[in-house]
């Protein structure tokens, strides 16, 4: 009989790896394409990410001169981690992408109404990764329709729950 490996049965993506979610992006945008990118971070930022002191809500991605940048992401520094430097919590951070991925982003953003937004920040093999999405902004009526659909799903779940019991 062969021994079963320790990794058997474990899922690759666990909830413990997620640092931050941008839930507002799902409400404000239709996400059409998703990409994974690395982040160029400083030491104090990595420590703050381990403590989950990050906010993606007001951030966006800008492609300038063939490079992708994360703008508006707030990483609050730990008081013990940054004693000899003056950290900037909202500094512009470089995203690490392949050239073809950057070209795809440039082509997507050139279309009218499209933008690139960060969706999720997580750990992968000890490295901080960010999931970005090519998205199109929702109009007010789209947001209302989504809200209505969510309410109906909740109500349906409640009805089914009471019906089964």
From Swiss-Prot:
A GO biological process held by the record: trans-translation
Subcellular location(s) per record: Cytoplasm
GO molecular function: RNA binding
Domain of life: Bacteria
Family annotation (PANTHER family): SSRA-BINDING PROTEIN, TMRNA-BINDING COMPONENT OF TRANS-TRANSLATION TAGGING COMPLEX
HAMAP family reported in the protein's UniProt record: SmpB
UniProt protein name: SsrA-binding protein
Species for this entry: Halorhodospira halophila (strain DSM 244 / SL1) (Ectothiorhodospira halophila (strain DSM 244 / SL1))
Chain's gene name: smpB
């Amino acid at each position: 009989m062969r021994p079963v490996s320790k990794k058997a049965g474990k899922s690759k993506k666990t909830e413990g790896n997620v640092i931050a979610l941008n839930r507002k992006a799902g409400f404000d945008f239709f996400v059409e394409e998703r990409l994974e990118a690395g982040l160029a971070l400083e030491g104090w930022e990595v420590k703050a990410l381990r403590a989950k002191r990050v906010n993606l809500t007001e951030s966006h991605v800008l492609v300038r001169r063939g490079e992708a940048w994360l703008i508006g992401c707030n990483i609050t520094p730990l008081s013990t981690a940054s004693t000899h430097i003056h950290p900037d919590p909202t500094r512009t951070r470089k995203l690490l992408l392949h050239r073809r991925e950057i070209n795809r982003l440039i082509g997507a953003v050139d279309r009218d109404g499209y933008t690139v937004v960060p969706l999720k920040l997580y750990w992968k093999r000890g490295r901080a990764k960010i999931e970005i999405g090519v998205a199109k902004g929702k109009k007010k009526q789209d947001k209302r329709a989504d809200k209505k659909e969510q309410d109906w799903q909740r109500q349906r779940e409640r009805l089914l729950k009471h019906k089964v019991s």
